[in-house]
């Protein structure tokens, strides 16, 4: 299998290249907090020599409760993203939830993300494909790794083959997720070598069966991330917050911002080691 290279500007993304970090905050809470978090990520990744793409959502359209914070919206969100790009020179990834958002978002950011819950919505896939932007497809919790090839095919039929796939866990009974480490390789093969990344933040979610917000297991983020990166992946997706207990979305799964550097030191060491090994085919 040949590993496909997808380029985000001058950043190459491939399963056999040094990993790319997709990281930032779950949702834009304020302009000032976005600047603070982005600056910290930029400082740490530059120090460690890790290619970096900033992540945040401008609208969390799939919150469990109608009363939950969703974000600043499209117009204000794009203004914040433009300022981040101008200030720090970063590439940016964000998600879209409606077809009409695809082009306005693609005009500002570098990667547009197809949310897991919407990954089989053909109208949205077609609208995103038409932008020509790099696409990050989240694997739905209810879809097997091998079925991701069908979603990739939709994008290719729509004229866009610049696809990254992202695993964020699979349903395990009610209100729980697990990550199948063998599934990463299945996704690579099902998509003809497309880059595969791991969203360790959302894989740590666990729900209160009667509550209106997701719980999480941030205390296990290092172990799960290390396990995933040992497979050999194109990138890692992780969200951080300076005060996870008071984050407006998914705080229980967020990495404390002050732990980012030591965390990434471990991840980079594993990635460097794994990708120094020659490929070993044990299928025959």
Swiss-Prot record:
InterPro entries (UniProt xref):
Aldolase_TIM, DAHP1/KDSA, KDO8P_synthase
- This protein's UniProt keywords: Cytoplasm, Lipopolysaccharide biosynthesis, Transferase
Q: Which GO terms describe its biological process?
A: keto-3-deoxy-D-manno-octulosonic acid biosynthetic process
Q: Where in the cell is it found?
A: Cytoplasm
Coiled-coil ranges per UniProt: none
The record's Gene Ontology cellular component field reads: cytoplasm
The keyword Transferase belongs to this UniProt entry's keyword annotation: yes
Q: In what pathway does it function?
A: Carbohydrate biosynthesis; 3-deoxy-D-manno-octulosonate biosynthesis; 3-deoxy-D-manno-octulosonate from D-ribulose 5-phosphate: step 2/3; Bacterial outer membrane biogenesis; lipopolysaccharide biosynthesis
Protein EC: 2.5.1.55
Q: Which GO terms describe its molecular function?
A: 3-deoxy-8-phosphooctulonate synthase activity
The entry sums up its family as follows: Belongs to the KdsA family.
Name of the featured protein: 2-dehydro-3-deoxyphosphooctonate aldolase
């Amino acid at each position: 299998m040949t590993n496909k290279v997808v380029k985000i500007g001058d950043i190459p993304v491939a399963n056999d290249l040094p990993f790319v970090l997709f990281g930032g905050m779950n949702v834009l809470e304020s302009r000032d907090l976005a600047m603070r978090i982005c600056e910290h990520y930029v400082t740490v990744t530059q120090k460690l020599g890790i290619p970096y793409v900033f992540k945040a959502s401008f609208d969390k359209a799939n919150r469990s409760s109608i009363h939950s914070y969703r974000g600043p919206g499209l117009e204000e969100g794009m203004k914040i993203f433009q300022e981040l790009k101008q200030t720090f020179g970063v590439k940016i990834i964000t998600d879209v939830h409606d077809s009409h958002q695809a082009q306005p978002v693609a005009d500002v950011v570098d990667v547009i993300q197809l949310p897991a819950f919407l990954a089989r919505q053909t109208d949205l896939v077609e609208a995103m494909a038409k932008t020509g932007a790099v696409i990050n497809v989240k694997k739905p919790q209810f879809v097997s790794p091998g079925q991701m090839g069908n979603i990739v095919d939709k994008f290719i039929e729509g004229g866009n083959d610049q696809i990254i796939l992202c695993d964020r866990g699979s349903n395990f009974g009610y209100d729980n997720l697990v990550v199948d480490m063998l599934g990463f390789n299945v996704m690579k093969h099902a998509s003809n070598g497309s880059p595969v990344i791991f969203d360790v933040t959302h894989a740590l979610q666990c729900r209160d069966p009667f509550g209106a917000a997701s719980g999480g297991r941030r205390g296990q983020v290092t172990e799960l991330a290390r396990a995933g990166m040992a497979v050999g992946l194109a990138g890692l997706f992780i969200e951080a917050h300076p005060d996870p207990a008071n984050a407006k979305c998914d705080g229980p799964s967020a990495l404390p911002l002050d732990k980012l550097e030591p965390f990434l030191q471990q991840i980079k060491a594993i990635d460097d080691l794994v990708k120094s090994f020659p490929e070993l085919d044990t299928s025959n």
